Amino acid sequence: MALRCPIVSVLGHVDHGKTSLLDKIRSTRVTQREAGGITQHIGASEIPINTIKKVSKDLLGLFNANLSIPGLLVIDTPGHEAFTSLRKRGGALADIAILVVDINEGFKPQTIEAINILKQCKTPFVVAANKLDRIPGWSSSNGPFILNFNEKVQHPNAMTEFEIRLYENVIKHLNELGFDADLFSRVKDTTRTINVVPVSAITGEGVPDLLIIIAGLAQKFLEQKLALNVEGYAKGTVLEVKEEKGLGRTIDAIIYDGIARTGDYIVIGNPDGIVTSKVKALLKPKELDEMRDPKDKFKPSREISAATGVKISAPELEMVVSGSPLRIVPKEHINKAMDEITEEIEEFTIKTDEEGIIIKADTMGSLEAIANELRKAKANIKKAEVGDVSKKDIIEASSYSSSDPLNGLIISFNTKTLPDAKLELEKTDVKLLEGKIIYKLVEDYGAWLKEMEELLKSDELNKLTKPAMIKILPNCIFRQKGPAVCGVEILYGTLKIGSHIMSDDGKKLGYVKEIRNNQQENIKEAKVGMQVPVSIDGNMILGRNAKENDILYVEVSEPEVRKLYHIYKDELRGDEKEALLRYMELKQKLEKSIFWGM
């Protein structure tokens, strides 16, 4: 059975050494002149199995590595944004991943986010515990870690420090996330235990161990997945859309199965539909020593087979976006390929809600990833699209917010905001959150949501009528009626202009027309403990339906009482709560229902 190269992606937290490790892996070769060294593909680097065997020759016997895969195809773009963008039907394009963790710093937010994405995509991974050379006293040199890991080479204190950092900063965190993990040389059951491979991207220590472990695991557990359809047509994913001088718009793609030929037809799935076009050229990069003219960087290939990175030149690629699924087929298979692509796009369709926010992303895979994370944060999503933030998006978000201010949000992942959209944004209350890190955008969403909920809660609370109890002061009746004017003391709560007043037998007496302070200045409200003159317009006649020392109540509707009691009770001051409870007790007695207000 013919096997293709496993596709390998590198993930990890910022500054933990993803790019440096990739550079070190790409530069792996026994000598500069070695035949079959690293082959640079479009968007990926192929490390042939012979190169892996040569740099790892001291390890082959230790791990009983009988490797028959042709090599490893390592995606050039590190990070989980690239990982999520590169999708195929059924999950991630990458067959296996390297999770880079700084052995000295341990897990960070992006490390955990990367693990969550790997779990979600069911992608097996190996941990590269990087920056081994920074452990105090560690003697790091290019070559296998396993040969350098002994007390003949290392000081005992350095060995002890290594063990502490390996456990405290890497293995313990993996255990907390539900994974068994251990140093790769101690792993007995690779189906249950994550391999942790210590490396230094600076010295190259551990890179041979990492390559042999990745290759061995891929062959052992992914053989069926790596079976190559040597007769079938090419299946792949768009990595990037680029303008190239002399070629126009081209696409860089990873082909993960089958064979593509010049003159075949490319079928690409887009959010807006399917694009078909005739392949003008399949291009591979020239070797470095052939790149004398920067305008002539590529050489045409009549035929390419998986797994590989390739640049494709074809007309009518304007609407293609990164992360789109593709097929390259003979003309007679176009309809079949279109059906496959349609089914694949349906897998990417994100379920939307009747109400919610808008999310935009640069690729379908990224859109799916951020939608999944926002769902975990309990976000409702009204619209999810690939592409830049447009004026139309702002207008739509503004209309969504008219029914609920919590819908007036656009989350933009790794996309631009068009100039007319920026102008429209200034005219509205729509909030735009932009970023290139998924976990940070989700955090920003959580912070915005909390702030908005508090603001809305405060606004609604301020609009509600709050209970208050007042007492008519003796010797302070200034006018009997039309309006009645008297001095009152606020016993509980806050008395406001416009509040409707009732007696303790439920009679409506009128509304508060005016409140004055001791300087005879009009004020809008009087709080607990204050003694103030008030005028009450309506049915109140002092000396008849209201007398000195009477306790009066601010009238509150039952729906408002329910909201105050069930939603906002914790937001009320102690005296306001007391006013609410006493008012409810009075109304339950008057209405002869213990459920009033409940």
Curated annotation (Swiss-Prot):
Q: Which InterPro entries match?
A: EFTU-type (IPR029459), P-loop_NTPase (IPR027417), Small_GTP-bd (IPR005225), T_Tr_GTP-bd_dom (IPR000795), TF_aIF-2_arc (IPR004544), TIF_IF2 (IPR015760), TIF_IF2_dom3 (IPR023115), TIF_IF2_dom3_sf (IPR036925)
Show the segment(s) annotated as G5: 200-202
Q: Where does GTP bind?
A: 12-19, 76-80, 130-133
Region called G1, residue ranges: 12-19
Q: Where is this region: G3?
A: 76-79
Domain of life of the native organism: Archaea
Q: Show where the tr-type G domain sits.
A: 3-225
Q: Which GO terms describe its molecular function?
A: GTP binding; GTPase activity; translation initiation factor activity
Per UniProt, the keywords (alphabetical) are: GTP-binding, Initiation factor, Nucleotide-binding, Protein biosynthesis
What cellular-component terms does GO give this entry?
A: cytoplasm
The residues that cross the membrane are none
Query: Where are the annotated segments for G2?
Result: 37-41
The reply on keyword Nucleotidyltransferase is no
Q: Where is this region: G4?
A: 130-133
- Endpoints of the signal sequence: none
Family recorded in the similarity comment:
Belongs to the TRAFAC class translation factor GTPase superfamily. Classic translation factor GTPase family. IF-2 subfamily.
Q: What role is this protein assigned?
A: Function in general translation initiation by promoting the binding of the formylmethionine-tRNA to ribosomes. Seems to function along with eIF-2.
Q: What is this protein called?
A: Probable translation initiation factor IF-2
Recorded source organism is: Methanococcus vannielii (strain ATCC 35089 / DSM 1224 / JCM 13029 / OCM 148 / SB)
